[in-house]
């Protein structure tokens, strides 16, 4: 009995040492301990009653068995053979994490059914994924994330063992081309769970072979990045994940340089790089794919965990709350494939990008010609919530991303506790952390101080405190907490003005970008477009929309324009335009800035060279700005007129 006990203790110690060996500052895997509240819970419930819970509205391939069987093609002429497995892997990951966060047994069963089927149908040598895909391992790189979610939620060591056998069925060279290289993410997670260093060495060798779009050579040269946007966002995380597990500075340098090259040349004001389908530059007329929003924020999470730097969490919040929320209708019943900071029309023929010009790709629809974004969008908010709370190597509980939620855990002494994050953030600057515990607990609490916040304050049980150490954008609050204790964090927000080339300006308030919400004529679009390959929503409650401007939107702002916040206390959902509590007024000048060809959002113009809209003396009008994420049609970057 004693020998068995010693063996168990040594085994536990080994597992602890293994998980800490790389010295990663922050770690995820807390999804079972996180519960959304407030507006986050409302949005996730809308997601469940919307597209995630109604795959028939998404049409093909989501109206299939997903990964719980064979998915047949819907057309012999459109789409590569791997598409339908990539797309349904995105969807499975999103619906499963949503199910865990909401405690929805139907979603959980549906997601786990695909995992069970995939495991039961492994090849004789342990390989997973559909046999028809041959050596295309990209869909499995996506599906791995769903398997990771189940393992972390259920504490299922068996999944790591299955993945270990799967990965060991390949050679490093098998991973080192195209998007196969993204399997490094799964390789290294599996290494962290099993301790098999062969997996680590495989990942390092595969990356060193190069030959993929964002390899070390592409990162280190002086050429700007010119590649597929989603591929870039996916491959961007690889050197930072390698750094997580090796702590080799060379990988960190590669990761930082790759991120700088991408953001310097392509990051848009809403926090996501342009990509339609390829990286497109910083002109506000350019769009980004909805997949870019989800994949970029997922990659930023690895930068956050690997470095422990709060700046990456700032970027996640900005991208999710602006670009992410702005690409969907707030009932989660339709989405855009391409979205942009300036979009004043969204119809079946309004896509202003060069790729698929004049097509459906910027319309708000449940179904799209290419189906990847319709699957990936389901990951956006579940990913955000599952990484709101992290753990550190030093035992700290880390409030990394803010929003109403609860986090439950057990202290080092074995005492249970729950922290309730009581806030309307980002619509409020006050965040209260309320402790409930069955005994006093000594717990280090890490709170992020966003880079946009010039000054912050912390109080404990109503008494201000300055006894907090700040490092890398976080403050450490360490004390013995008692049941009922409240830590209050105040993050004052101010309107910030940012110039944008070539002729523009935009405003932000805390993490939220501000936009002019264009009055909209919204009508159901019943046209079955030729590019849709016959796809229509298979649920009449889910509509394809045609959105056109119903009033003037052609405004320029003077160089000294400064929005003023208006009183707007509401109790509704804060991302609904009519309910948002954040409203700002600013004086604007009407200018001649018409649609291109009567159906495309026009490029940003030099307003100093434009005539007034009336043709005579410039007319000034007070307009209202609201959070970008509360809009569908919008102007975010305004032309600057004469002062």
PLM regions with names:
Residues 22-87, 105-127, 204:
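Low-complexity, Ser/Thr/Pro/Gly-enriched N-terminal "stalk/linker" regions
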Residues 453-479, 497-502:
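Solvent-exposed beta-strand/loop surfaces of large extracellular or lumenal domains
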Residues 70-71, 77-81, 89, 98-208:
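Extended ligand-binding groove/face enriched in aromatic
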Residues 255, 314-322, 327-434, 470, ...:
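C-terminal beta-rich recognition modules with glycine/proline-rich loops and embedded aromatic residues
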Residues 59-81, 128-143, 179-194, 217-238, ...:
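Carbohydrate-binding/catalytic loop surfaces
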Residues 244-265, 284-332, 343-344:
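Catalytic-core region of carbohydrate-active enzymes that cleave or remodel glycosidic bonds
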Residues 24-33, 99-112, 147-161, 191-204, ...:
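Structural helix-adjacent loops and short alpha-helical linkers that scaffold large soluble proteins
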Residues 82-100, 135-151, 176-192, 227-244, ...:
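Well-ordered alpha-helical segments within folded domains of soluble proteins
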